[in-house]
A protein has these predicted regions:
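Short linker/helix segments within small regulatory modules
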Residues: 130-134, 163-164
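His-Asp-centered metal-binding catalytic motifs of divalent-metal-dependent phosphohydrolases/nucleases
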Residues: 121, 142-143
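Disulfide-bonded cysteine motifs in exported proteins
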Residues: 114, 134-136, 154-155
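Cysteine-rich micro-motifs
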Residues: 136-142
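Short Fe-S-cluster ligation motifs
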Residues: 146-190
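N-terminal pre-ligand scaffold of iron-sulfur
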Residues: 20, 33-132, 171-204
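N-terminal secretory signal peptides and thylakoid transit peptides that target proteins
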Residues: 4-26
Length: 204
């Protein structure tokens, strides 16, 4: 009778199985940059043809003349007529007017940012904290922190992830002659506005 190797006890992985696992992981990581993640991750929509209002929770449109410096509001985008759809995390964005030291007192579009609120680590919802000594985005689940100027994670588990999964998806904004703020049609790709829950390559 042929000698049989002893069973693998205690859930330990043999050296051979470990090497096989590492080889498989390496193969997967090789192709990650070439995957069209927009087809797999739940983004709000494939295309948005026209600009949309930055609509606040009270139904008013954000305006450069009235929105306070160093403050933020959650905004739904793209908004639908279905209240259930509008509750989806992947439609929730943090609209921020930067603090004074980051240019928030300017009455132009450079004073504003709009990032997906879906944390890039495990998809909890982060928020902006305007308190002295903070003035950053913080995820309550595992402590990832985001720079309000760029959307890049600078602390916590999201900051340890490789690009583009360390920078939040961002919407481009514009201001009309009345000071009302609008969202430009996005390009849902890592090299464009990013992919919600996956990230964005940071433009230099």
């Amino acid at each position: 009778m042929a000698h049989q190797p002893p069973p693998n006890r205690g859930g330990k992985v043999s050296r051979r199985d470990f090497l096989k696992l590492m080889a498989a992981a390496g193969t997967v990581l090789t192709f990650v940059p070439f995957v069209d993640w927009g087809k797999f991750l739940p983004n709000p929509t494939a295309k948005v043809a026209s600009r949309a209002k930055v609509e606040l929770a009270d139904g008013t449109q954000a305006n450069v003349k009235t929105f306070p410096v160093n403050s933020s509001k959650a905004v739904i985008y793209p908004k639908t007529d279905d209240p259930t759809l509008n509750k989806e995390s992947f439609r929730t964005w943090q609209f921020i007017r930067l603090p004074e030291e980051l240019g928030g007192t300017k009455n132009d579009i450079s004073a504003f940012r709009m990032y997906s609120m879906v944390c890039l680590h495990l998809w909890c919802l982060w928020k902006y904290w305007p308190d002295p000594g903070r003035k950053r985005g913080e995820c309550p689940c595992h402590g990832s922190m985001y720079d309000p100027l760029t959307g890049k994670a600078f602390a916590g588990p999201a900051s340890l992830q490789a690009p583009p999964s360390n920078v939040l998806a961002r919407l481009d904004l514009e201001i009309d002659s009345s000071g009302n703020i609008w969202i430009k049609p996005p390009n849902w790709s890592p090299n464009g506005n990013g992919i919600v829950g996956y990230g964005r390559f940071l433009r230099e």
